[in-house]
């Protein structure tokens, strides 16, 4: 039986998570991409605590964007999560693309977070 895209994504994500882990010094920037929205969280895996988060569902972003499923929306989320992380003193993270290919919306989010000051 052929594997579906979702199964392939889960398999890639498990493989990535074996190698990528967030610490208090260098937390993990996790990205979840759905068909209509994108979500980003900065996570300390040791304490199992989310330090900062942003998504296209937030009222200020939702009103200013025409759709949550564009590269423009992803860049806005990347900038916002980076600003919230920097406000809490987080400058360096490890990037967890969530099994998604590093292309399009995921790449736009990562580039915007880098431009806003996060290092990874």
Swiss-Prot record:
SS bonds (residue pairs): none
InterPro entries membership: Ribosomal_uL18_bac-type, Ribosomal_uL18_bac/euk
GO molecular function: 5S rRNA binding; structural constituent of ribosome
Region (Disordered) location: 1-22
Function: This is one of the proteins that bind and probably mediate the attachment of the 5S RNA into the large ribosomal subunit, where it forms part of the central protuberance.
Family according to the record: Belongs to the universal ribosomal protein uL18 family.
Name recorded for this polypeptide: Large ribosomal subunit protein uL18
Organism: Crocosphaera subtropica (strain ATCC 51142 / BH68)
């Amino acid at each position: 039986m052929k594997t579906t895209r979702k199964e392939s994504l889960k398999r890639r994500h498990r493989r990535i998570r074996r190698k990528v882990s967030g610490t208090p010094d260098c937390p993990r920037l996790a990205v979840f991409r759905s068909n209509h929205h994108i979500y980003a969280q900065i996570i300390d895996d040791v304490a199992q605590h989310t330090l900062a988060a942003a998504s296209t569902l937030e009222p200020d972003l939702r009103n200013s964007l025409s759709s949550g499923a564009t590269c423009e929306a992803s860049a806005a989320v990347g900038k916002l999560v980076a600003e919230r992380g920097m406000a809490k003193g987080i400058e360096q993270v490890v990037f967890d693309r969530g099994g998604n290919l590093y292309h399009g919306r995921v790449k736009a989010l990562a580039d915007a977070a880098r431009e806003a000051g996060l290092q990874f």
